Amino acid sequence: MTTAAQLRAESARLLTEKQGSSQGLVPTMGALHEGHARLARTAVEQNDVVVASIFVNPLQFGEAVDLDRYPRTLEADMELLDAEGVDLVFAPAVEEVYPGGEPLVRVTAGRLAGKWEGASRPGHFDGALTVVAKLLHYGIPGTGLPGGGAFVTGAGAGLPAYRAYFGQKDAQQLTLVRRMVTDLNFPVEIVAVPTVRSADGLALSSRNRFLSGEEREAALVLSRALRLLEERANAHEPLDLESAQALVESQPLVGLDYFDVVDPETLEPLAENCKETPFRGEGLAIIAAKVGPVRLIDNLPLSS
């Protein structure tokens, strides 16, 4: 499907046909891999009707060259989603999502957008939240039914439950989407799905295809550094972020952007408080680096 009207009509038809009580949305930019398959699989397990979207959002790319370079693999993506049991695929053109060109009004990510990924990619999260907001609106279940469109779902509302699925790998985006949904009263439950990794520990990413063999081997240092912090947290020891960072910086093909331990909800740094004393509570180790020409991000939840 390529239009919001088609999406609403077809999802309403399927909900009626299945006598469904829940609908899931899996927003993607395509170039799908096993991480996306896990998102789709989880959504199918938890909902009666599942919609996946494939849309390369121009608003979240800083440079046109990055947008042009992003891989488009629609046919393969459709096959993957079909194999996972997704009911509907929404693959709109840019003109469908932004019919008047770039929108005058956007969702702004606020102060959380200026740190970590946002510091390196100005405007990225404003663009990402704007398109997520639109996709969440398109996917509200029941709006294609006669009399549909009420901005309420769930038990007692007369409309199906509504869930949207995001990967833990994009931790800052996940945090911001959750805040947007809470602060702006979106009628949707955000479900986080754990990061999927290859057997050697590399977090799956659509960008991995651009790594040479040597660069891919070098990129493994990111997950190894995160695991060092996890081991220390599990052992109730000080985190020793400096040693983990030195491991990353010892790899000549890797240019470190940031590496820290933050509060999972506020994204404020925690590592400074854990240099001398054992780590306690919940945290999120986050890292970003350029490996050759490819920018990679990863993270790992910490608990002690």
Curated annotation (Swiss-Prot):
Other comments on record: The reaction proceeds by a bi uni uni bi ping pong mechanism.
Organism: Arthrobacter sp. (strain FB24)
Function: Catalyzes the condensation of pantoate with beta-alanine in an ATP-dependent reaction via a pantoyl-adenylate intermediate.
GO molecular function: ATP binding; pantoate-beta-alanine ligase activity
Biological process terms in GO annotation: pantothenate biosynthetic process
A Pfam family annotated for this UniProt entry: Pantoate_ligase
Organism phylogeny: Bacteria, Bacillati, Actinomycetota, Actinomycetes, Micrococcales
UniProt binding sites for beta-alanine: Q60
Keywords assigned: ATP-binding, Cytoplasm, Ligase, Nucleotide-binding, Pantothenate biosynthesis
The protein, known as: Pantothenate synthetase
